[in-house]
Amino acid sequence: MARMVNCIKLGREAEGLDLPPVPGELGKRIYESVSKEAWQQWVKYQTMLINENRLNLMDPRARKYLSEQMEKHFFEGGADAIGGFVPPAQ
């Protein structure tokens, strides 16, 4: 049976991650309170952040920026907006 979490991003109970996605305290917090579905949403958003901001992941500043954005995305109400991005109409 899948591990269920009360996902803070989706606001409902959903299947939890199998392992902490990142090391450290942030990874533990995400593991305990973020669902697989919400994590996949973050991965897509992170990809847009990397591409639109032309981040080089070899640069420690870029990795720090993404870590900060990840924390904002899940625990502080949202990450930085992506310049020029218009979400599709639903």
UniProtKB/Swiss-Prot annotation:
Name of one Pfam family that matches: Iron_traffic
Signal peptide: none
InterPro entries with a match to the protein in the record: Fe_traffick_prot_YggX, Fe_traffick_prot_YggX_sf
A single Gene Ontology CC term: cytosol
SUPFAM superfamilies: YggX-like (SSF111148)
Coiled-coil spans in chain: none
Keywords assigned: Iron
MF terms (GO), sorted A to Z: iron ion binding
HAMAP family, per database record: Fe_traffic_YggX
Function comment: Could be a mediator in iron transactions between iron acquisition and iron-requiring processes, such as synthesis and/or repair of Fe-S clusters in biosynthetic enzymes.
Protein family membership: Belongs to the Fe(2+)-trafficking protein family.
Protein name from the UniProt record: Probable Fe(2+)-trafficking protein
GO biological process: cellular response to oxidative stress
